[in-house]
């Protein structure tokens, strides 16, 4: 086959990287925000708040994986055999990956872990998208509110210490 007739293969790089090992999943489970509904659980860790490299005993923090490559967010999928056979599990994983690709701007700077339940298979893509967006927006709002509260506490603490000194 001549080279001119061959189709150009232009692969777009995906904007996410996957969580690779148990320690990365455990970090998101322990330090991240959790949200549950009937169909899946969503664990979200804000990577902008991850400690820098070398602090708190982390050899390679998750936030460094975003800076090294051109990835926007990290994605982990944990689909157990209770959900169904391999065909059902792979369908759920494909749908969840495409959801995060579709809404990559919302997921930017986050590490996401999905844990689907057995009822998740019966949802169509649009219903799954609706539940995903509700959960993600509520988690992002919670993160923003907690940051504001933390900033207020730190500012008031600084004001009190300055008043004590002078």
UniProtKB/Swiss-Prot annotation:
- One GO BP: tRNA 5'-leader removal
To which protein family does this belong?
Answer: Belongs to the RnpA family.
What lineage does UniProt assign to this protein's organism? Bacteria, Pseudomonadati, Campylobacterota, Epsilonproteobacteria, Campylobacterales
Q: Which GO terms describe its molecular function?
A: 3'-tRNA processing endoribonuclease activity; ribonuclease P activity; tRNA binding
Q: What Pfam families has UniProt attached to this entry?
A: Ribonuclease_P
User: Could you tell me what reaction this enzyme catalyses?
Assistant: Endonucleolytic cleavage of RNA, removing 5'-extranucleotides from tRNA precursor
Keywords recorded for this protein, A-Z: Endonuclease, Hydrolase, Nuclease, RNA-binding, tRNA processing
Q: Which GO terms describe its cellular component?
A: ribonuclease P complex
Q: What is its EC number?
A: 3.1.26.5
Q: What's the protein here called?
A: Ribonuclease P protein component
InterPro entries under this entry? Ribosomal_Su5_D2-typ_SF, Ribsml_uS5_D2-typ_fold_subgr, RNase_P, RNase_P_CS
**Subunit structure of this entry?**
Consists of a catalytic RNA component (M1 or rnpB) and a protein subunit.
What Gene3D superfamilies does the annotation carry?
3.30.230.10
Q: What does this protein do?
A: RNaseP catalyzes the removal of the 5'-leader sequence from pre-tRNA to produce the mature 5'-terminus. It can also cleave other RNA substrates such as 4.5S RNA. The protein component plays an auxiliary but essential role in vivo by binding to the 5'-leader sequence and broadening the substrate specificity of the ribozyme.
Which PROSITE patterns does UniProt cross-reference here? RIBONUCLEASE_P (PS00648)
């Amino acid at each position: 086959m001549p080279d001119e007739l061959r189709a150009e293969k232009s692969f777009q790089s995906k904007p996410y990287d996957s969580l690779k090992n148990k320690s990365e999943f455990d970090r998101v489970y322990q330090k991240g925000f959790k949200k549950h509904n009937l169909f899946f659980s969503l664990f979200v860790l804000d990577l902008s708040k991850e400690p820098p490299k070398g602090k708190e005993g982390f050899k390679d923090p998750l936030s460094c994986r975003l800076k090294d490559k051109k990835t926007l967010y990290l994605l982990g999928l944990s689909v157990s055999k209770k959900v169904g056979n391999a065909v059902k599990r792979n369908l759920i994983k494909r749908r969840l990956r495409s959801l995060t690709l579709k809404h990559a701007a919302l997921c930017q700077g986050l590490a996401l872990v999905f844990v689907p339940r057995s009822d998740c298979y019966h949802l169509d893509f649009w219903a799954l998208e609706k539940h995903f967006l509700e959960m993600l927006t509520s988690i992002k709002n919670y993160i923003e509110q907690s940051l504001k509260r933390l900033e207020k506490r730190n500012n008031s603490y600084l004001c009190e210490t300055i008043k004590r000194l002078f």
